[in-house]
Amino acid sequence: MTKKIEEKIEGVIESLGYLLYDVSLIKENEQHVLRVSLKNPNGAVSLDICQQVSEIISPLLDVCDFIQDAYILEVSSMGLERTLKTPKHFKLSLGEKVEVKLTNKESFQAVLKDANDLSADFELEDHAIKSVEYKDLKKVKTLFEW
């Protein structure tokens, strides 16, 4: 269902100059919550941007009626520290510092240099490039340094 929602709202969000990072539908305290995460290629995602996107996609979602039950729409920034789960997440996070945990229990910190539909390339501290297929990744999380 979230894939259908993503397909419906992605073009609208891009027409406003922003990028759709993720869509998730969860249940919190017996209430359905539709979370839409954005990236602003020109800087931060402000409260005004979230409100603008919410006001535009809310009626669109109501008309499409993808979600049968009542729900709360939350529009937010993708966040400074987040788990990368899909090739799209990796592509939208190029150049960021990440913590990588592999299925073979190896872990390292690196800069995400490239990503495609099958793998991601990480620049290690010694500037060597390590290419890893997504199937070999256990968890990848962006790191924000203060």
Swiss-Prot record:
Q: Does the keyword Cytoplasm apply?
A: yes
Q: Which InterPro entries match?
A: Ribosome_maturation_RimP (IPR003728), RimP_C (IPR028998), RimP_N (IPR028989), RimP_N_sf (IPR035956)
- Is Cytoplasm one of the keywords UniProt gives this record? yes
* Compartmental location: Cytoplasm
**Which Pfam families does the UniProt entry name for this protein?**
DUF150_C, RimP_N
Q: Which Gene3D superfamilies does the UniProt record give? A: RimP-like superfamily, N-terminal (3.30.300.70)
Recorded hits in CDD domains, A to Z, give: YlxS_C
**What's the main place this protein lives?**
cytoplasm
Query: What is a biological process (GO) this protein takes part in?
Result: ribosomal small subunit assembly
Paired cysteines (S-S): none
UniProt keywords, alphabetically:
Cytoplasm, Ribosome biogenesis
According to its record, what are the GO cellular component terms? Answer: cytosol
Q: What does this protein do?
A: Required for maturation of 30S ribosomal subunits.
- Family note: Belongs to the RimP family.
Q: What is the protein's given name? A: Ribosome maturation factor RimP
Which species does this protein come from? Helicobacter pylori (strain Shi470)
Its lineage opens with: Bacteria, Pseudomonadati, Campylobacterota, Epsilonproteobacteria, Campylobacterales
Gene name? rimP
